[in-house]
């Protein structure tokens, strides 16, 4: 059922050079417990890149790659959310753009799987 996605997330977590071992442990535990929002927060704390956090944030643990592609195709809907974050100054315009770029990059990765 989410086999391939779980492996990808595991690989991302294992291969990332983390700044904080505690945040890493918390991110992994939260992901395993299904608390994806907390997993993302902890992943950012552990120094994950925008692309890696996108993978966690959108937690599309799908039964098939085709389903994943369809779901990730909707990442373009993030643009209004990113705009809101920019206006609230929760994140810089550059960070918001990196998140959007990461979603496009991840779509390409999925297409090649």
What is the predicted role of each segment?
Residues 1-113:
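Terminal alpha-helical segments
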